[in-house]
Amino acid sequence: YMLHNRQNYDFSVRTSSTRTNKTESGNGENLYGTYMSDGATNIRVNGNEYADIFPVWEWDRIPGTTLPAGEKRNPVDWGSKGTCIFTGGVSDGKYGVMTFKMDDYGVKAQKSWFMFDNEVVCLGSGIGSNVPTDIVTTVNQCHLDGNVWINTGKALQQATQREFAFEQAPQWIWHDSIAYLFPQGNNIKLKMDRQKGNWAKINFNYPATEISMPIFNLVINHGQSPRNASYAYIVVPGINHPEKMKTYSCHHLKIERNDTEIQAVNNRKSGILQIVFFKPGTFDNEEIKVKALKPCVVQIKKSKGKVTDMQIADPQNQEKLKPGVDVIIL
């Protein structure tokens, strides 16, 4: 679990591993919370984004997750261990990166979240599935609050339809003080409609009275049985009006790698480079060369061209890694 707090927002990621239990289901509660420990994210600016939303949630579209279409009821009471070994992160207390190598429900994916002052960069690679249904990465599913604006690169338009599909993603989508940028141009689907449900579906102790709420539902669709698919999106919270996106630029953020060996993001404004090594290897962007002798997560701080700080961690929680020994700056 990693929580990233800033003055204008907070962002959290929840994962599981072979060392931890997933969410529990007992006493007739949390009946569809199966996927809540599989990379679930919360993006909050005003604090009410998910308030009492759960009766109408599509539980196969939990924000942050990469999953097969179709809700799945929790099969085991009181929790079960996760299936993934490579899960964890690194932080200096201000910036951090979280990673999750998923292999469950017939889906494989390598997912990481790179957290900076004003943005969170979300990357996925190596996405594959033997499940004969669409595999979907959910960007967000929250209350629909106010207008939605879409910048296609050619025009800025207010979303008036209930549903949009983009084979090539727009530059950004704005809703409720949060902007979502799509630098990779994935297949994007957006729904803005009322979703129906009831509390009894997820908790036997509550009434089955139907509830209906307007929901903002934004996903990346990888299609059926993808092979080595990937995604990239950037969350920019705290943008209180779409007009402010006219002066916003993410050019200081560079996605250096997003493949099955390395995921890396370079924030040239803050001098922070974050790297996930899924296997031993070398990262080289012509500005810095980093060699990892073991799988790890690395965060490097540079100032005036010199490395001033570095944190490393083993997401497999097997050993304490050492700078200059297990991770070497060449």
Please provide the spans of the model-predicted regions.
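Extended polysaccharide-engagement surfaces of secreted carbohydrate-active enzymes
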Residues: 1-296, 302-308, 316-319
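Beta-strand-rich binding/interaction modules
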Residues: 24, 320-330
